[in-house]
Design a protein with these regions (language model features):
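Extracellular acidic, Ser/Thr/Pro-rich low-complexity tracts
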Residues: 302, 859-861
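Short beta-strand elements
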Residues: 388-408
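N-terminal beta1-alpha1-beta2 submodule of the flavodoxin-like/Rossmannoid cofactor-binding fold
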Residues: 856
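Glycoside hydrolase catalytic-domain context in secreted enzymes
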Residues: 1-388, 406-838, 842-852, 868-913, ...
Length: 937
């Protein structure tokens, strides 16, 4: 069966999603949508340089193009753009080019702005009917935002633009091309007529923004976060960014759960809020209850003058009981179809009370380590945001109900206090009270020893292949008895980055990563960074999709699922089995640099959006690796900062989205985090990965570490080579090693097996998890030649050659017949290693054979920086190598080139990220022997 990856349809769908996720916060006097023939002046350099995404691994998609707002407005033709002002900007940009930074995590949060004087604003106003001011921000992996000018706050230059433009123009629209929410106090200062968050909409973001501005799409986005008056109003700000210990003292009171319970007056724009160009009237049609399931029916009527969509949100207020609860919890949401003026739709929303059960981590209810519904009234509210929701009915429980019995797991070991509400008199908001957090009472070491598998068998090679398990001729357990201890150990190692065993430029290969494993018919699976598109560091292009925050703001999981069907097709086309995403960490604080990758401050919205992505990709036999499990809520010192969290907050907030993705989305690949939670680095946390994930949730997939993660034994510091706890915890794969067979990371798994800290049965258990993933993968189908679906392409603008410029020829070299071991210098005088640049050497080979291209280089960046170099011969990729930041130390990397024919060749280097200092580069002749063993050319 053939399926078609239609890139025009892909672009149209991504554009629609980006428009649907745009959030209109203000629209005075109906200034939007723009009207036909209006004259518009556009201010702010981001009008030309649209941020498609944030930075780091989640943003490194080589997009074939990125649309911007100004060109898209002119392409649309609805309005007349002030071309005099546009020309001034374009001339200024020639001397003030976009600053891409000096490498990994060195990109600036914002870009320098062209000064806008009172006179310039006045002149533009004389030629225009209204103004659009475009402001841009970015942040990302290894780089949090800051409560400073140019990041969370406006710069002085931006303040000047807004002040002068708003004074000169009667109508001003502000467009925010940002990954995170930002400080919004300037709205009160300057009073622009309209404010529109367009987030980071991928490569179609510019066109999508214009669709909203011109009314082709009525903005239906709703905030997936609460925008407070000030950054200090978020309770997590006090502890956010601590380099050593981050105490989650706000506990379960994150986002609107905090503000609606304790600080209603600190909210500028509430969770779930977003305006439309039309008006809707909502009417409750009743609340029906069957058991613990409540059904809300809400009639929505478009009483305005434009077609549009509305989102209905259901919140529940649970009785305070003995545990204390937030005054609102999102229980369900639904979005209408496109309603024409006068049209109506009845939405049926179902809310399961058991999903709102509270976890008793102290035993105060008499049911320690249980999820409970305490006795009392459960009040249902329905509205279009959390603040406007009105009561529609109540469900009364006469007595406490135990919903689920769990096991104490991952409780903190350090004492601290957490927030809980205290209500006094008739107040509709709580007073902050504090209580001691329950600490761990179980013996974790004893639990691990008691539960570890010990029975295993080694029978040697019986001639069975993994295909025999696939065809149900033998069991997986039988198959694994053939594998030696060394085979099982090698299987715990993923190879990368940019392993030549899988799709070029991708993050890792795993499964059959050694010759020995491949002899048993174990395929090599491939994963690639995401979540907003496929990252291929060799320069291969892929579609850049709207980012996580924008997707959540659509409140439309069906639309997101449809988009990720297309992503699934693209993954399959590129022979990639898993996208490293969605990212589903909670927006605990607006300053987290990777919030753009994640969805929301709410775990229910987060989980349902993640499930939608997984379902979409799953329709084409591929999947996503949900990440980062768990509490990856700051980037600063993310390798070592200890997240200290109550067990209740973990289960109700920070793990809940993952639980939904597993149970509703069918997740079968998960990535753990870099840092520790309650003293244990998550990559080796038994209670997280076995007790909760596998035993309680019934998870049957794989778990991989984040790239070059640390692991520890309790009470010890983290180490990249300490893999014994990793295997024991069922974190199945360490990501990544350069070579699995040689144990290039020098991990201690074999040592642990020899001294009894590990058993062969534990290794077999992890191998079984990996094989279960492989058995359902397209990699297995490809290996067996049974791939049923074939991908064809339509309208493809995507190149499989290197991205970036084609590169200037830096040197032309005639290579004399070299002797074995002879080194031939390549000149570096004109070489640029900036991100996206290409450099070409014209080489005339006079001797066939094997050569090594050797780089001697350094980087001032830290060890988590990822700096890829791709090498092409005559536009054919030879290999991509990735070095990590070396903190100034000189290192050596090499690429093997097999020259089978003499004559002239063009060797191109493509640098995927800035930050490399090249000290020396040369070709070394190795010889003619074994040339056929190399896959190059």
């Amino acid at each position: 069966m053939k399926y078609t990856l239609d890139y025009e349809k892909y672009a149209e769908l991504a554009r629609r999603v980006a428009a649907e996720g745009s959030v209109l916060l203000r629209n005075e006097d109906g200034v939007l949508p723009l009207q036909k023939g209006q004259r518009v002046s556009i201010f702010g350099r981001t009008q030309f340089e649209h941020y498609k995404s944030g930075t780091g691994s989640g943003g490194m998609v080589n997009a074939p193009y990125v649309t911007n707002i100004t060109d898209s407005l002119k392409e649309d033709g609805t309005v007349q753009v002030n071309e005099v002002l546009e020309a001034q900007y374009r001339e200024w940009l020639k001397d003030h080019p976009f600053d891409i930074g000096e490498g990994w995590a060195m990109e600036p949060w914002n870009q320098e702005e062209m000064p806008v004087s009172e006179e310039l604003a006045r002149q533009a106003a004389e030629q225009s009917d209204l103004a659009i001011v475009v402001l841009g921000r970015t942040a990302g992996e290894d780089k949090d935002n800051s409560a400073a000018e140019g990041s969370y706050l406006l710069t002085a230059a931006e303040e000047e633009i807004l002040r002068n433009v708003c004074n000169a123009f009667a109508r001003t629209i502000v467009v925010l091309n940002v990954g995170n929410i930002m400080d919004m106090k300037w709205v009160d200062r300057y009073q622009p007529q309209a404010v529109l968050y367009v987030w980071q909409g991928g490569q179609e973001g510019g066109r999508a923004t214009v669709d909203v501005l011109t009314g082709k799409v009525n903005p239906g986005g709703k905030l997936s976060d609460t925008i407070a008056e000030d950054i200090e109003d978020y309770p997590s700000t006090e502890n956010f960014g601590d380099p050593v210990e981050n105490f989650y003292t706000e506990d379960i009171y994150v986002g609107y759960r905090y503000f609606e319970t304790f600080a209603r007056d600190k909210v500028k724009y509430p969770f779930g809020f977003g305006l439309s160009y039309t008006r809707f009237q909502t009417e409750s049609m009743g609340l029906a209850v069957q058991g613990t399931e409540a059904t809300v029916i809400e009639k929505v009527t478009n009483v305005g003058g434009m077609s549009g969509r509305e989102t209905i949100q259901v919140y529940v207020e649970a009785p305070q009981g003995k545990l204390g609860k937030p005054l609102r919890q999102l229980a369900a949401y639904a979005k209408t179809e496109e309603l024409k003026p006068g049209a109506s739709e009845e939405l049926i929303l179902k809310a399961e009370l058991t999903e709102l059960a509270s976890y008793d981590d102290s035993g105060v209810t008499g049911h320690k380590s249980c999820y409970v519904l305490e006795a009392g009234d459960y009040i249902f509210y329905v509205g279009t945001d959390v603040r406007s929701a009105r009561e529609v009915g109540r469900v009364t429980l006469a007595e406490l109900q135990v919903v689920r019995t769990a096991t104490e797991a991952l409780a903190p070991v350090q004492a601290f206090k957490r927030l809980r509400p205290f209500f006094f008199g008739e107040n509709d908001h709580a007073i902050a009270n504090w209580e001691d957090v329950p600490l761990r009472t179980i013996d974790l070491t004893e639990r691990i020893l008691r539960e570890r598998p010990t029975q295993s068998e080694y029978v040697g090679d019986q001639g069975w292949k993994l295909a025999d398990v696939y065809d149900k001729k033998i069991t997986l357990e039988q198959f694994l008895t053939q594998l030696s201890d060394e085979d099982l150990i090698c299987m715990t190692r993923g190879e990368g980055m940019c392993s030549p065993k899988v799709t070029p430029g991708t993050a890792a290969a795993f499964g059959g990563v050694t010759d020995g494993l491949q002899q048993f018919g174990i395929p090599v699976a491939c994963c690639s960074d995401g979540p907003s598109g496929i990252r291929m560091d060799c320069g291969t292009m892929a579609y850049a999709l709207p980012n996580g925050t924008l997707l959540a703001c659509t409140f439309d999981p069906e639309l997101v699922e449809e988009l990720y069907e297309m992503e699934g097709m693209e993954l399959r086309k590129n022979k990639i089995d898993s996208l490293l995403g969605p990212g589903i960490n909670i927006h605990r604080n607006p300053l987290n640099g990777r919030n753009f990758e994640y969805f929301s401050e709410d775990p229910y919205l987060t989980g349902t959006m993640a499930a939608a992505q997984l379902k979409g990709m799953g329709k084409y036999g591929v999947t996503g690796t949900i990440k980062h499990f768990a509490c990856n809520n700051q980037e600063f010192k993310r390798h070592d900062a200890n997240a200290i969290v109550s067990e209740r907050a973990l289960r109700e907030i920070y793990l809940k989205g993952f639980e939904i993705a597993v149970k509703q989305g069918g997740a079968y690949s998960i990535m753990s985090t870099y840092g520790p939670v309650n003293g244990l680095w998550t990559a080796g946390s038994y209670d997280l990965l076995t007790t909760i994930l596998r035993k309680e949730w019934g998870y049957q997939g794989i778990v991989m570490t984040d790239w070059w993660a640390k692991i520890n034994e309790e009470g010890e510091s983290g180490s990249k080579s300490q893999t014994v706890p990793m295997v024991r915890a069922q974190n199945d794969i360490y990501m990544v090693t350069a070579d699995a067979a040689s144990n290039s990371n020098k991990d201690n798994t074999a040592e642990g097996l020899a001294d009894g800290r590990l058993t062969r049965a534990q290794l077999m258990r992890n191998a079984a998890n990996i094989c279960c993933f492989l058995l359902r993968s397209v990699a297995m189908e490809r290996l067996l030649g049974r791939e049923e679906e074939e991908c064809t392409e339509l309208h493809s603008p995507v190149s499989t050659e290197g991205a970036g410029d084609s590169g200037q020829v830096l040197a032309r070299l005639e290579l004399p017949e070299p002797k074995t071991g002879e080194e031939i210098e390549l000149p570096l005088e004109k070489l640029s290693t900036k991100k996206g640049t290409g450099a070409v050497y014209q080489l005339r080979f006079t001797k066939i054979g094997r050569y090594e291209l050797v780089f001697r280089m350094s980087s001032t960046l830290g060890p988590l920086a990822q700096l890829p170099i791709s090498v092409f011969l005559n536009n054919t990729l030879q290999q991509t190598v990735t070095i990590n930041g070396t903190e100034g130390k000189v290192v050596e990397q090499s690429v093997t080139l097999a020259i089978r024919q003499d004559g002239e060749k063009y060797m191109k280097l493509y640098f995927g990220e800035s930050g490399i200092d090249m000290h020396r580069m040369f070709l070394r002749y190795v010889g003619k022997n074994d040339i056929e063993s190399f896959r190059n050319e």
